Amino acid sequence: MKQSNVEGEIVDIIQSARNEFDGIIINAGGYSHTSVAIRDALDIFKGKIIELHISNIYKREEFRHKSIISGVVTGIICGLGINGYILAINSMHEMLNENK
């Protein structure tokens, strides 16, 4: 598990994950709506990706309704609070083990 609030560090974490992990669970917060760099790094990652939002982005301000990273992720979980992390971990486990 890695965490950063710095866009460049998040990109570095995603890029290093290409050689270490089969999946990424990402809560990019406000960067979901603004960061082309994070989107591009996720797009290069070949594993499974779950985008996570603690709040329901569709119940918030209009500009939050569009996540630019959604187009390159495997699935999205939003609006379930911190329980979304448990669902994301369980879902990732299922996805990574479905062909074994």
Predicted regions and their residues:
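A charged, well-structured terminal subsegment
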Residues: 78-100
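Short beta-strand elements at the ligand-binding edges of bilobed clamshell
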Residues: 64-82
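Short, acidic/small-residue loops that bind anionic groups at enzyme active sites
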Residues: 44-60
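N-terminal small/polar loop signature for handling phosphorylated ligands or for N-terminal nucleophile
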Residues: 3-46
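Alpha-helix N-cap/helix-start and coil->helix boundary motif
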Residues: 7, 31-32, 55-57, 82
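Hydrophobic/aromatic beta-strand patches that form the interior of the parallel beta-sheet core
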Residues: 2, 50-52, 77
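Structural motif
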Residues: 23-24, 48-50, 67, 74-75
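Short, conserved acidic/polar surface loops in the N-terminal third of protein domains
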Residues: 36-37, 60-63
